[in-house]
Amino acid sequence: MQTRITWHGHSNFQVASGGTNVLIDPFFDGNPVAAARWDAIDRPDLVLVTHDHGDHVGQAIDICKATGAKLGCVVGTDARLVEAGLPRELVLNGIGFNIGGTVECAGARITMTQAYHSSESGVPVGYIVTMPDGFTFYHAGDTGIFSEMELWGRLYAIDLALLPIGGVFTMDPRQAALACSLLRARSVIPMHWGTFPVLEQNTTRFREQLANHAPDCRLFNMTPGESLTLDRSQEGCAC
């Protein structure tokens, strides 16, 4: 089975595998590096929002209303999104879910993790998603490094980690590289860099730090708008 990952820039990813399409942090309008419009992407079955900041909520409400996709978020952020126009029936689990909880949607299993950041509502979170074919990825959201990443790496065989490296508001390259080791991630795609001048502008330092802290973790360098296809039998994924 193959998994297709598309990076729309910043923390905005689509992951399609086993017939299910998951979109995370759909920041299109106002995203200076987004290569597509929100209404021109492949239809998602599920939209996940990591926290209530404009560059992560993005066009989640518009996309869900246009496609009927469910929206997954932490309890507390659901009310803010419904107030902003999201139909309540499109909220995954009716009211959202919470850290440590697992829900199912479109054949995928989604577990919510903690994140260390800020949010206008609810709390910031990350997600570990196991697709219908077993491919498992972790989207960290905006976060600093935290020691409990090691526990998530013991609980789940993470085929792919999507980690912020931009610094200032999140982990920097050194912290993100050590996070790969804690998570025991088989591969990593860096995110939350290059979007704005205040962030890390390339992945050079991350590549160097990864060689020091997690040399067995495979780095996939992507550019906004690029898609990557992983074959689990060739990549050595656990699933």
Swiss-Prot record:
Stored HAMAP family: UPF0173
Native organism is Nitratidesulfovibrio vulgaris (strain ATCC 29579 / DSM 644 / CCUG 34227 / NCIMB 8303 / VKM B-1760 / Hildenborough) (Desulfovibrio vulgaris)
Q: Which residues form a coiled coil?
A: none
Output this protein's name: UPF0173 metal-dependent hydrolase DVU_3308
Keywords, ordered alphabetically? Hydrolase
What does the sequence similarity comment in the record state about its family? Belongs to the UPF0173 family.
Q: Which GO terms describe its molecular function?
A: hydrolase activity
Lineage: superkingdom = Bacteria
Q: What is the lineage of its organism?
A: Bacteria, Pseudomonadati, Thermodesulfobacteriota, Desulfovibrionia, Desulfovibrionales
Alphabetized InterPro entries for the sequence: Metallo-B-lactamas (IPR001279), RibonucZ/Hydroxyglut_hydro (IPR036866), UPF0173 (IPR022877), UPF0173_UPF0282_UlaG_hydrolase (IPR050114)
